[in-house]
Amino acid sequence: MSVILAIFIAAAGCLFSSWRIYWSPWACFPGPKLAALSSWYEWYWEVYRKGQLNAHLQDLHASYGPVVRYGPKHVHFNDPALYRDVYKWHPSFGKDPAFYGAPKYSSTFRETNISKHAARRQVLSRRFSPAVVRQRMPVIERHCEHLWQKLDRLTQAGRKNFNFFNLCRSFAADLLSTYMSGTTFGCMDDDEQGFDGNFIRAIQHTSDTYFDNRNIFLARWTSLLKMFGYGPPPLDKMLDELTFSDGLVEDYLSAKDSKGKEDTVFAILTQPGAVKDFSPLSKPELMAEGRSLLAAGVNTVGFTLSSTLFYIARDEDVQLRLQTELDTSTPQQTLASLPYMVGNLSIFILSDRLTLYTRPPV
């Protein structure tokens, strides 16, 4: 009986493996057979090798072409001609829930229902459109002026070296928190000697532990140690990113009634009838959205600012041409109307920064 059972299991395994490799709807895409067989292939490169999947995908493209299958149901493309077809304005297919997990309260970035995502995105576009951002320029200018004043104080005190990535992340966090709730995190003032404030340390801790937290073997081992009282100490709340993002929502809701009419992101997300088929967010939903916006905005804007300024600073010719164009511009001109700012400079920066990114996965 045991022999028959073993034969049956082996036969079922062979059939299942053959189906995934040769007969599934994804079998038409080229790629390693091991990747087609099991999602552990992706886990190995993304989690165990801590983020090496993107680099490995470029090696796969060199071997298999512009479209590569790197999981049982995952493909990756590096042909720009496919971008508009996949990331079109009105998608005909939804996001894969398995990729985003199963959050109790979805945010815009993690919402897998197409109609709900469209309604939430339409609401947010009213606060992040270019026209609205231009109207909020006084807020941006105020934060810029605050940053210049702190840099002046630090340089006058003899400080010559700064963590420029943290500087840009602090600026982004203060600006984004103000834009979202009307109050600022105060990251630029949190560290008197630089820009290593509590929130910046918290998001850095999240980045540093991201792959460890996704490692199911490490998580189960840690849980087992906790059962016997040998687990790691509780996480310092000041290193928990959620302490700050959820606190921003708590502070906004507690003072909402006394603020009157606002034009913040949280305000429009809690207004009834903002757009058709949109329901005002509850407190847990607003917290989920706040976490998502901060996670998507602070590191991204910080990296973009710091890397862009680096590429400008390393080339004196670019600095000179940019400064000349700004000095000779008139008050009536906008940055978008300056040819070098939006033309040659953008191409110069993007051509260098292409080495920092890989093509988006599907």
UniProtKB/Swiss-Prot annotation:
Gene Ontology annotations for the cellular component aspect, listed alphabetically: membrane
GO biological process, one term: secondary metabolite biosynthetic process
Transmembrane parts of this sequence: 3-23
Keyword hit for Cell membrane: no
Keywords per UniProt: Membrane, Transmembrane, Transmembrane helix
InterPro entries: Cyt_P450, Cyt_P450_sf, Cytochrome_P450_monoxygenase
Top-level taxon of origin: Eukaryota
Molecular function per GO: heme binding; iron ion binding; monooxygenase activity; oxidoreductase activity, acting on paired donors, with incorporation or reduction of molecular oxygen
Compartments in which it is found: Membrane
Keyword Acyltransferase set for record: no
SUPFAM superfamilies documented for this protein: Cytochrome P450
Subcellular location, principal: membrane
Pfam families from the UniProt entry: p450 (PF00067)
Biological pathway: Secondary metabolite biosynthesis
Record membrane topology: Single-pass membrane protein
Family: Belongs to the cytochrome P450 family.
Task of the protein: Cytochrome P450 monooxygenase-like protein; part of the cluster that mediates the biosynthesis of a highly modified cyclo-arginine-tryptophan dipeptide (cRW). The first step of the pathway is perfornmed by the arginine-containing cyclodipeptide synthase (RCPDS) avaA that acts as the scaffold-generating enzyme and is responsible for formation of the cyclo-Arg-Trp (cRW) diketopiperazine. AvaB then acts as a multifunctional flavoenzyme that is responsible for generating the cyclo-Arg-formylkynurenine DKP, which can be deformylated by avaC.
Alphabetical list of PANTHER family matching this protein: CYTOCHROME P450, P450, PUTATIVE (EUROFUNG)-RELATED
UniProt-recorded name of the protein: Cytochrome P450 monooxygenase-like protein avaN
Native species: Aspergillus versicolor
